[in-house]
From Swiss-Prot:
This is Serine--tRNA ligase. Homodimer. The tRNA molecule binds across the dimer. It comes from Helicobacter acinonychis (strain Sheeba). PROSITE patterns: AA_TRNA_LIGASE_II (PS50862). The lineage of its organism: Bacteria, Pseudomonadati, Campylobacterota, Epsilonproteobacteria, Campylobacterales. Transmembrane segments: none annotated. One of its GO terms (molecular function) is serine-tRNA ligase activity. ATP binds at R262, S263, E264, E349, I350, S351, S352.
Length: 415
């Protein structure tokens, strides 16, 4: 959540950031501006009434001590108190309206984030590893998965519905091996391995920014204040919800393997075949909680950590800087890692590493103490990696002419 003080003191800065994102809010910015103007006016009136109440109360006290008639002051205090209570209630209601608006306003766009309206305006930073030259036409992963008996798409539909899969046989062993490789790699890079619940309450989803704006994107347990997590970013970040951390403990680096659940609202017709877009998928996540001065360096560190796994698996990939119009709600700056898929003849996202600055920290009340003063931390998150998409990339990049799949050396010890 952005700072309420910033909204009140520099409304134009917030409006400019929303414009960069091509983002709109309910009732429009002008309506919000009107609410803020009215709030400021009433706040001044409230402070004036409070000052008057204090002044008259002192005068009343003096007269009472002197045993002088103070009935006129008493009446004045009673009338002023009625006005004070009414105005205080009105100011409180306006604060709630402003806070509700704040909860659905996305993060401020970082100065490093380029302007743009969609993914078409994202900027390639660099490529890592050269895509292989095939002597045959490479197949897509769903053909290879079925040929090798790695993935049973029909059973996924039978057990649940579309966008669910069953991984079995040697494919299940490869899938498990990928998870072990990712966790081991992350641990070597200083990230603590943590296993968390796959269900969280509403407060936790508010903390990381999924609620209230994106309620339709998450699965809610009927008759419970519980939701299936869309990413371990939610649980790892919120381990420190409403916590004051000693500055000596920063940075805090965590990694978790969890199932993730997404409704994929608005994705009808996209990636209907295969494992690219699923309602349930496994992901190994990185989350870091840092001192504000260290978050930029941490973002680079997390990118290189995720990239290191792809290098070990001999998978060509690239770094892409997201433009302002393609940023996620909580992100101030995001760099995607896209992996090469020869079957699709294109790069596809396999990780997003985002710096949310103090946006999530303010929502989740995550602070650190330095020089006897509490300040907001910075939080970062990124996939390291999406397991299903990594297996997709492995199948497509390491396929052989006969349809078999070569296993990279980095995975051998896990199989």
């Amino acid at each position: 959540m952005i700072d309420r003080k910033l909204l009140l003191q520099d409304f134009d800065k917030v409006a400019h950031s929303l414009k960069k994102r091509n983002s709109v809010i309910d009732d429009g910015l002008e309506r919000l501006r009107e609410i803020i103007t009215h709030y400021k006016k009433q706040l001044i009136e409230l402070e004036s009434l409070q000052a008057f109440q204090n002044k008259v109360s002192k005068e009343f006290g003096i007269k009472m001590t002197q045993k002088v008639d103070a009935s006129d002051l008493k009446k004045e205090l009673e009338n002023n108190k009625i006005k004070l209570n009414e105005l205080s209630k009105s100011v409180s209601e306006l604060e709630q309206k402003i806070d509700l608006k704040l909860s659905i306003i996305p993060n401020l766009v970082d100065e490093k984030t380029p302007l743009g309206t969609s993914e078409e305006d994202n900027i390639e930073i660099k490529k890592i590893l050269t895509p292989r030259d095939f002597t045959f036409t490479p197949k897509e992963h769903f053909e290879l998965a079925q040929k090798n008996g790695w993935i049973d798409f029909e059973s996924g539909v039978k057990l649940a519905k579309s966008r669910f899969s069953v991984i079995r046989g040697f494919g299940a062993k490869v899938y498990r091996a990928l998870i072990h490789l990712m966790l081991d790699f992350n641990e070597k890079n200083g990230f603590e391995i943590i296993y968390t619940p796959a269900l969280v309450n509403e407060k936790m989803l508010f903390g990381t920014g999924q609620l209230p704006k994106f309620k339709e994107d998450v699965f809610k347990i009927e008759n419970e204040n519980l939701y299936l997590i869309p990413t371990a970013e939610v649980t790892l970040t919120n381990l420190y919800n409403d916590t004051i951390i000693s500055v000596e403990k920063l940075p805090i680096k965590m990694t978790a393997h969890t199932p993730c659940f997404r409704s994929e609202a608005g994705s009808a017709g996209k990636d209907t075949r295969g494992m690219i877009r699923q309602h349930q998928f496994d992901k190994v996540e990185l989350v870091a909680i840092t001192h504000p001065k260290e978050s930029d360096v941490m973002q680079e560190y997390m990118l290189e950590s995720a990239s290191g796994i792809l290098k070990a698996l001999e998978l060509p990939h690239r770094f892409v800087q997201l433009c302002s119009g393609d940023l996620g709600f909580s992100a101030s700056n995001t760099i995607d890692i896209e992996v090469w898929l020869p079957g699709q003849n294109c790069y596809r996202e396999i990780s997003s590493v985002s710096n949310t600055r103090d946006f999530q920290a303010r929502r989740a009340k995550i602070r650190f103490k330095e020089n006897q003063k509490n300040q907001l931390v910075h939080t970062l998150n990124g996939s390291s990696l999406a397991v299903g998409r990594t297996m997709v990339a492995l199948m497509e990049n390491h396929q052989q002419a006969d349809g078999s799949i070569h296993i990279p050396k980095a995975l051998e010890k896990y199989l």
